[in-house]
Amino acid sequence: MLKGMTRLVSRVHKLDPGRFSHLGTQAPQCPVAHLDNQVPTERTRAISRTLENDPAKHGEQHVGQHYNISIQELKTVFPHGLPPRFVMQVKTFNEACLMVRKPALELLHYLKNTNFAHPAVRYVLYGEKGTGKTLSLCHIIHFCAKQDWLILHIPDAHLWVKNCRDLLQSTYNKQRFDQPLEASIWLKNFKTANERFLSQIKVQDKYVWNKRESTEKGSPLAEVVEQGIMRVRNATDAVGIVLKELKRQSSLGVFRLLVAVDGVNALWGRTTLKREDKSPITPEELALIYNLRKMVKNDWQGGAIVLTVSQTGSLFKPRKAYLPQELLGKEGFDTLDPFIPILVSNYNPKEFEGCIQYYLENNWLQHEKAHTEEGKKELLFLSNRNPGLLERLCAYL
């Protein structure tokens, strides 16, 4: 079995998931829309599961156990931001289950004891590739959504600094560039996750879009969001206005605000984008990045800033880099300092056992030795308890 599984490791990145029926196909924009009429079935609860589905009540006793998020809630809270392979797992198992892990519990403890009269505290999740930073961030987002926070979620900041489909000179500031398609897509997902807030929050300034259209002071923030969705040319400016209004009004105590950015290191460094004369565009010249940088400053109150630094998708960084100072660079590190670093490491023994048991309960491991202690030891050896590698190994067993 060891030789066979070793060969799988070498092939795991070469295999095309689309060729395997149990992995499903690439996720659509709303990853769980096809599950509207499906109800997750109850299974026997074992070591891998907990009946406590409220993140606010998770504690040390739940480490290594999976909790369930209803399909409807998943659609609302996570219209974007879930890892593609996790989306495949949701499709395959017909349920969405997140593992309770120590880094998320540490962060939950901090959030529960936050003094919101003080400036927003920055938390940075970091760790080696595949350790589960994004899913730990999703656990925090789910907690805040259940606590009725407004969620400002940037699922992968790296997508804003490379391979842009449409880049236009900003009408607001000629020194910057708009990304209308990226901005419009983000606004649609922001609306899905926060629709209940948008009619309640009133803009505190008048915003003029063109000679005929404007949003008056006191209008619902929903009007700004709709302007960006319906008039894609105005989407980048609409995002800037939304961020400005949220930052200002959360400080007034109107609502609690979570700023969650996956891959925040993309905000500093280099981009792949170029002007017409082929000269490079820097991140601060992109209006979306310029405005997002303002949101990760701790000069506002009434919320929290939870960030991840990630080598996945990053540009011009060593493949093995994972420490904040390595990925952020001097400018980014100095901008975010002070922050609370939270290491997301490989599974501990309890988490590893919970993951294996979860796969076994769902009949995901078909190899004849997968149920044995010998099989578990070989999976442990081959994966080194790395969550991402373990998931890929198990997908082909």
From Swiss-Prot:
Catalytic activity: GTP + H2O = GDP + phosphate + H(+)
Residues modified as N6-acetyllysine: 174, 206
Transit peptide: 1-17
One function term, GO molecular function aspect: structural constituent of ribosome
Example GO BP: apoptotic process
Known EC number: 3.6.5.-
Main location as per UniProt: mitochondrion
Subcellular localization, as worded in the UniProt entry: Mitochondrion
Keyword annotations: Acetylation, Apoptosis, Hydrolase, Mitochondrion, Ribonucleoprotein, Ribosomal protein, Transit peptide
GO cellular component: mitochondrial inner membrane; mitochondrial small ribosomal subunit; mitochondrion
The keyword Ribonucleoprotein is assigned to this record: yes
Family matches, as InterPro entries: P-loop_NTPase, Ribosomal_mS29, Ribosomal_mS29_met
Leader sequence residues: none
Family, similarity comment: Belongs to the mitochondrion-specific ribosomal protein mS29 family.
Subunit structure: Component of the mitochondrial ribosome small subunit (28S) which comprises a 12S rRNA and about 30 distinct proteins. Interacts with DELE1. Interacts with NOA1.
Entry function: As a component of the mitochondrial small ribosomal subunit, it plays a role in the translation of mitochondrial mRNAs. Involved in mediating interferon-gamma-induced cell death. Displays GTPase activity in vitro.
PANTHER family, sorted: MITOCHONDRIAL 28S RIBOSOMAL PROTEIN S29, SMALL RIBOSOMAL SUBUNIT PROTEIN MS29
Name by which UniProt lists this protein: Small ribosomal subunit protein mS29
Protein species of origin: Bos taurus
Protein encoded by which gene: DAP3
